[in-house]
Amino acid sequence: MSLTRLHIETFRNISLAQLDPGDGLNLIYGQNGSGKTSILEAIYFLGMGRSFRSHLSQRVIQHNDDKLTLFANLSVCEQESKIGLRRFRNGETEVKINGDNIKRLSTLAETLPIQVITPESFSLLFEGPKSRRQFIDWGAFHSDKSFHLAWANVRRILKQRNQLLKNQVSYSQIQYWDKELVRYSEQVTEIRKQYVDSLNEQLKGIIGEFLPLVEVKVSFTRGWDSKTDFGQLLETQYLRDVAAGNTGSGPHKADLRLRVGVLPVQDALSRGQLKLLVCALRIAQGKLLKQQTDKNSIYLVDDLPSELDAQHRKLLLQQLMDTGAQVFVTAIEPAAIVDSLATPPSKMFHVEQGCVTVIDKPTRE
């Protein structure tokens, strides 16, 4: 899977740009503020319907326009697909895949699986469980078609249950919702657990490449004690949940725990090692996606030279190339990337003040 053409219009500081990326590694370079990260952001927006830099999507639309337009040709198993997205300042979104109107943004994510490695993505290990649940759920969504609806049902029921808790209704009025919550929670949890088990198998060898002297143990916690019946737990904790006004246990509290020995990785590893661990997690996800669905992810790697030293930069780039995936990497100076590659990039693009120029014959400096 790879993007063969990308059209960007009125997105951030890019008024109009068209790129024909290569199948392998695409290097995008330019000074800070030139617009190189905006290209990665546009690809992400096309696959997810939102930005990885801001939760306010309207901010990515140029101030003198009322909409942005993104379009791409996508090659999948030698077949061409077309994806188009238009986002208006009022929040409305139009999405088309091969000319058909698409109602659900999840269809975009299914069509264009994207992995992101940016300075912000290293917060996966430092922030709360939410970001790690999202990491698990990316894989669960792609590995099992029933996950998306089951998780949507969990969130819908939790919203209803929490409102009833705030209204301090009797447990008999909540009992029906608890039965439904248990049903879908068990489905979500089983899919998540199976996914993490499969991810662990992929992860072992990759962590060995990045952190050869470190043994990292990865475990999944479901959001309640696995030895406890979830339905009974909801009833037992009812008064506590009423006092809190929300549901204290469930799949919305799940987490991915990573340890070295008995210590959390945050306490056992240096910041540089933690960055390598996040890279290993992202690569493992991409390899598992390929194994389970025969689809490659598209990797977006922002500002790589500032995050890793030359040795580990070379290792990461080699690991990315070994996945067979299409990769987009940004840097201020092209030499920082070119000198870390065994072969030249598939394509190079220079960005200056929102204008993109293709460099036809990338060479080492």
Curated annotation (Swiss-Prot):
Domain of life: Bacteria
PROSITE patterns membership: RECF_1 (PS00617), RECF_2 (PS00618)
UniProt entry tagged with the keyword Ribonucleoprotein: no
Biological processes, Gene Ontology terms: DNA replication; DNA synthesis involved in DNA repair; double-strand break repair; SOS response
Amino acids binding ATP: G30, Q31, N32, G33, S34, G35, K36, T37
S-adenosyl-L-methionine recorded as keyword: no
Keyword terms: ATP-binding, Cytoplasm, DNA damage, DNA repair, DNA replication, DNA-binding, Nucleotide-binding, SOS response
Transmembrane segments: none
Location within or outside the cell: Cytoplasm
Alphabetized GO MF terms: ATP binding; single-stranded DNA binding
Chief site of localization: cytoplasm
Function comment: The RecF protein is involved in DNA metabolism; it is required for DNA replication and normal SOS inducibility. RecF binds preferentially to single-stranded, linear DNA. It also seems to bind ATP.
Family classification: Belongs to the RecF family.
Name this polypeptide is given: DNA replication and repair protein RecF
Source organism of this protein record: Shewanella halifaxensis (strain HAW-EB4)
Lineage: Bacteria, Pseudomonadati, Pseudomonadota, Gammaproteobacteria, Alteromonadales
